[in-house]
Amino acid sequence: MSRAYQANPALNAARANLRATDEDVNRFQAGYRPNAALSADIGVQQFQGSIAGSQLSGRRGLTVPSGAGLTINQNVFDGFQTDNRVRSAESTVLGTREGLRLTEMNTLFNAAQAYMNVLSDTATLELQRNNVEVLEEQLRQTRDRFNVGEVTRTDVAQAEARLAGARSQVSAAEAALRASIGIFRQIVGVEPRQLAPGRPLDRYVPTSLDQAILIGLKEHPQILSSLHAVDVAELQVKIAEGALYPQAQVTGAVQQRYDQQFPGDNGVTASIVGRVNIPLYQGGGEYAAIRQAKENVGRARLVADQDRDTIRASIVRTWGNLEASKAQVIASQAQVQANEVALNGVREEARVGQRTTLDVLNAQQELLSARVALIRAQRDRVVNSYDVVQAVGRLTVRFTSLPVTPYSAREHLDQVRDLWFGVRTPDGR
């Protein structure tokens, strides 16, 4: 799980998406900052001298007017739109963080599931291979007994049929194991090697179903992400309403002009201008935008309610699966023990002629099926414990204390929030 946390492509893509979303905060904070621009121009102009007493009087000629200037615009008031855009971006970041936490939980659960699938498929393959060896010995003994007249050709055929079926089961088990290894490689990034036995995550499972539901409704990232989406939708209403407010800005400009009207006509101008724009009517589009934003708030709240119901149902389902798998392990263990006793008894009875070869083959098959079922039940027992912890929103590196450095979702935003200049990312790209 630690390796999957560090190297899983889907999880790393979600982290990159969060970093990109962080930049929206800085992008909208630009509305607080001044805009500055330099300009320069040059041209050709014909002039007619007409200034009394001037050497230019009565003369015609060409002048080359040119100049350069600096203009600075500062937003003073925009109907609180910049404030609300920044707050909306911050809420979007918080929602994206919860989305990252959801991806983290899914990745860790998928890694645990893939781990247990490899273990269970490996154990199943070993059982199927051992079964082939047992049936090969059974067929040899049956043929020996047939040669001395103790059994019929039918018994030999039955043993051969069971052996052929067992070999096909080995092939199926090998294919299943290869598929599980492929999924493990996809999620974790490496081939499975010397896997230790899996253990349930019981110490992180809530003590009761009611407690699990309370925790899930409070902490699950899908619900928290939906609540942040409601905040974003409400702020979009305020942003749309800001279009009805007056807009105010201050512009400062400095210009140096050369040969403006005639050669030698040079000068410097400077100005500071305040402007206020009061919207009266803009075709009604801004009112439609406000109504639309309010409808989006209602939709976001309904989605949040839907997510609560979804998480509640998921917790109930996973809790039931965990309880069922616990009982299944106990029942499968008892079934294996009973089938082992039954097989030993059938073999003893077959030696004295009270049981047929088919009885022995059936007893062996029942024991094999019970052992495979026990492996599956043990696998489900572990996976379902992880599923419950995931369903309540706690299958994370920080909560389960995995031996890996947790990814800091806040660090990048702190690095870029107040950057005024620069095109390089904090990691140097």
Language-model-derived ranges and their functions:
Residues 18-20, 25-27, 86-88, 93, ...:
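Heptad-repeat amphipathic alpha-helical coiled-coil interaction surface used
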Residues 12, 35-62, 73-102, 224, ...:
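Small/polar (Gly/Ser/Thr/Ala-rich) solvent-exposed segments
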Residues 46, 375-429:
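Acidic, low-complexity, intrinsically disordered peripheral segments
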Residues 102-215, 318-321, 325, 345-348, ...:
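Periplasmic alpha-helical coiled-coil/stalk elements that build and connect Gram-negative outer-membrane
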Residues 7, 14, 75, 82, ...:
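Amphipathic alpha-helical coiled-coil segments and their boundaries
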Residues 1-41, 47, 75, 192-230, ...:
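Bacterial Sec-pathway N-terminal export signals of envelope proteins
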Residues 69-71, 115, 273-275, 319:
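Membrane-embedded beta-strand positions in outer-membrane beta-barrel channels/transporters
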Residues 26, 71, 236-239, 275-277:
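Outer-membrane beta-barrel architecture
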